[in-house]
């Protein structure tokens, strides 16, 4: 039996969920086709709006950097919408996540620094409030004595490496940074198998099997005279309640730093967005994968998925939020890069020819890779094109869109939410005209 919705969204990451939430709030019936974990489950817990220009110049605020971005990279999705539109959507997203209680700090008006797990300082827009952050203009970090606590036998977080790198920054040269390990004998079973000694498994054991008082005492003892305590993000799988309780009971200034994936901070954020979408009445088709579409008269009529290969899924509008190569939203064959479901028109930047594989990569591994700027081409309404013609009811949001390198510029999350909210607005407007 065929299913029909107002809107079908392909992809359950930040872009797909943001778009779905906005549409559900407006009374639309949405379904998200979700194939596996999203990139949020591997993220740092911070969201970037714009951190750097293509010429390498660091950005303090989006408003300050926009004109240079437009001059240097006119194909960037932000430049299709204009400065004021991007700022408006960034503000709208901040209001949305405040309502959801996503536990983040930051503002679209000004970037801030977050401390990275390797002891770096990264410019970003929004950060989970459990992560150590500081204002861009602060000369010194707010505490002089920092203790970095690891977990004995846990190699996805290296306290000594973090401490040695952090002290190199001018903002931390006044700090005394010490390191120590939590022993936690309750984790001995996990230590026997390194594959199982990951943040998710640690969190599950700590929440459900550990005597809480003993954990509090061990953290207090290992912290010494530290004024700020940095911990690996292994304390609270589904939400931040367990970590907040630890902070309260220890009486210490505890901070979490994301570990190697999976990232508990990203998992928590993804779960909150997903739960809110479902609370609004949205449907999530988990473990399913969109395979192909039927397009007639420049409109998508239906799509077929791995679990619905005989009966299509119908909708008035479709949103492609399937992510980039990491999520298989984009794929490569020998002679070209393509989007596999609709095979729509692609775009890159000046360094890449989509149909010439010799231009897809840079010689230096650590250099920005041209293929990372490849993606689908959109117009100012986030609509897609096929053979140069607009598909009227097909929109794109997030990292599946091309024309920019999200890793190089630090703008992946910003593009995701701005395009998601823009697509939602245009879908609502189109349905209201009918």
Swiss-Prot record:
- The EC designation for this entry is 1.1.5.3
Cofactors named for this entry: FMN
State if Transcription regulation is listed as a keyword.
Answer: no
What Pfam families does this protein map onto? FAD_binding_2
Q: Name one GO biological process term.
A: glycerol catabolic process
The keyword Flavoprotein belongs to this UniProt entry's keyword annotation: yes
Give the UniProt keywords, A-Z: Flavoprotein, FMN, Oxidoreductase
Q: In which pathway does it act?
A: Polyol metabolism; glycerol degradation via glycerol kinase pathway; glycerone phosphate from sn-glycerol 3-phosphate (anaerobic route): step 1/1
Which transformation does this protein catalyse, written as a reaction? a quinone + sn-glycerol 3-phosphate = dihydroxyacetone phosphate + a quinol
Q: Per UniProt, what is one GO molecular function of this protein?
A: glycerol-3-phosphate dehydrogenase (quinone) activity
Gene Ontology cellular component terms for the protein in this record? glycerol-3-phosphate dehydrogenase (FAD) complex
According to its UniProt entry, the function of this protein is described as: Conversion of glycerol 3-phosphate to dihydroxyacetone. Uses fumarate or nitrate as electron acceptor.
Q: How does it assemble?
A: Composed of a catalytic GlpA/B dimer and of membrane bound GlpC.
Q: What family is reported?
A: Belongs to the anaerobic G-3-P dehydrogenase subunit B family.
Tell me the protein's name.
Answer: Anaerobic glycerol-3-phosphate dehydrogenase subunit B
Species this protein is from: Histophilus somni (strain 2336) (Haemophilus somnus)
């Amino acid at each position: 039996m065929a299913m029909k919705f107002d809107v079908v969204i392909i992809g359950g990451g930040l872009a797909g969920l943001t778009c779905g939430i906005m549409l559900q709030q407006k009374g639309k019936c949405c379904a998200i086709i979700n194939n596996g974990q999203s990139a949020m489950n591997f993220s740092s817990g911070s969201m970037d709006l714009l951190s750097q220009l293509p010429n390498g110049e660091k950005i303090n605020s989006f408003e300050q950097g926009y004109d240079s971005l437009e001059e240097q990279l006119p194909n960037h999705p932000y430049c299709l919408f204009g400065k004021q539109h991007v700022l408006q959507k960034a503000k709208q997203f901040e209001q949305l996540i405040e309502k959801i209680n996503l536990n983040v700090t930051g503002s679209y008006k000004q970037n801030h620094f977050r401390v990275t797990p390797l002891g770096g300082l990264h410019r970003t827009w929004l950060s989970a409030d459990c992560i150590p952050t500081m204002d861009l203009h602060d000369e010194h970090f707010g505490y002089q004595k920092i203790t970095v606590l690891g977990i004995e036998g846990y190699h996805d977080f290296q306290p000594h490496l973090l401490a040695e790198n952090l002290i190199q920054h001018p903002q931390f040269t006044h700090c005394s940074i010490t390191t120590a390990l939590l022993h936690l004998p309750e984790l001995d079973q996990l230590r026997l198998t390194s594959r199982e000694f990951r943040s998710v498994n640690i969190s599950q054991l700590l929440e459900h099997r550990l005597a809480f008082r003993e954990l509090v005492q061990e953290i207090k003892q290992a912290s010494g005279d530290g004024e700020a305590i940095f911990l690996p993000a292994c304390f609270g799988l589904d939400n931040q309640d367990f970590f907040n309780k630890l902070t309260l009971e220890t009486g210490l200034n505890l901070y979490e730093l994301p570990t190697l994936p999976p990232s508990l901070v990203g998992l928590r954020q993804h779960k909150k967005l997903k739960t809110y979408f479902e609370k609004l009445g949205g449907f999530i088709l988990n473990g399913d994968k969109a395979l192909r579409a039927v397009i007639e008269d420049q409109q998508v009529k239906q799509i077929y998925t791995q679990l619905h290969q005989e009966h299509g899924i119908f909708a008035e509008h479709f949103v492609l939020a399937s992510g980039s190569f990491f999520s298989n939203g984009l794929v490569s064959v020998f002679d070209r890069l393509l989007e596999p479901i609709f095979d729509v028109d692609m775009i890159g930047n000046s360094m890449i020819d989509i149909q010439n594989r010799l231009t897809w990569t840079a010689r230096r591994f650590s250099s920005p890779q041209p293929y990372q700027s490849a993606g689908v081409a959109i117009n100012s309404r986030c609509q897609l094109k096929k053979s140069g013609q607009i598909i009227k009811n097909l929109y794109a949001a997030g990292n599946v869109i091309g024309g920019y390198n999200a890793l190089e510029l630090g703008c992946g999350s910003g593009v995701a939410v701005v395009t998601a909210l823009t697509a939602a607005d245009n879908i609502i407007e189109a349905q209201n005209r009918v």
